Amino acid sequence: WQLGDVAILTSVFYRFTIAAAIMLALVLLSGRLQATSKQDHGFMVLQGMCMFSLNFVCVYTAGLDISSGLLAVIFSASTLFNAVNSRIFWGERPTRVVFAASIIGIAGLSLMFWPELKADSAKGVNLGSIGFAFLGTSLFSLGNMISVRHNKKGLKPFTSSAYAMFYGALFLAALLIITGTPLTWDSQPHYLGSLLYLAIIGTVAGFTAYLSLVGRIGANKAAYATVMFPVVALGLSTVFEGYAWSLSSACGLGFVLLGNGLVLGIKLPFFARSKA
């Protein structure tokens, strides 16, 4: 519903302008805004570009040509991106359990969305769109690494996300001006409804919860949430839209839950000597 008459850049700008306004209002009214340094703001600008602007422009652009199922599978690769980037930026060696859970989760999502993946394969998917999806995923992972930095400096997600969303919205505004993209609007109720849902639930609530998780259990384990998001979406679709489960989707769910169990610390014989 966000991919229609309104330009992608404009829709993403609306989303993060609304989200930034809500986040800043919340931290100011609750008195939870922390003191920050110039260096902190430099990193929050980078986080805004990686996690709250460019990555979504890339993902939305990819969504014009490839299915939501393929997007979900590609985005779940953030578990692997985070494992590699944690090693590069923070010297954290990813465990065998993290890699195993990531591969199992991605395989599970592939099975769950197998019909969509087959359809994409049959029609011939634009490699450029797949590239945009992977670029958006890699930018999201870099945003995770910056969040780890904030946590090490004692910055809470409420403060860092509020500023980062604000900077992300400013960056998007600059892109709108540079590219000459118009601020058009879709008067259909579903456009406003989906925009508010994505801004409030998907961004303010979702990212605050996710980045809090990054601070508590680390970026490697927290990234597995990106595997669970589409599973929850399919669960809601089952209840409200009558989604029909197939053998492949049921098996895929089993793989995803197995991967989630590994991340949460369930011990299997082969991984008994590894720490999650």
Regions found by a protein language model. Give the residues of each.
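Transmembrane alpha-helices of multi-pass small-molecule transport proteins
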Residues: 4-54, 81, 138-146, 161-180, ...
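Membrane-interface helix termini and inter-helical loops of multi-pass transporters
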Residues: 1-5, 64, 113-126, 177-194, ...
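Specific transmembrane alpha-helical segments of multi-pass solute transporters/efflux pumps
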Residues: 24-75, 111, 199-217
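Specific alpha-helical transmembrane segments that line the substrate/conduction pathway
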Residues: 10-21, 51, 59-102, 136, ...
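Helix-helix packing/entry segments at the starts of transmembrane helices
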Residues: 12-14, 71-77, 146-169, 199-239
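Juxtamembrane helix-loop boundary signature in multi-pass membrane transporters
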Residues: 33, 77-138, 179, 247, ...
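Hydrophobic/aromatic residues within transmembrane alpha-helices
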Residues: 2, 11, 15, 62, ...
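C-terminal-most transmembrane helix of multi-pass membrane proteins
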Residues: 12-17, 24, 114-115, 191-193, ...
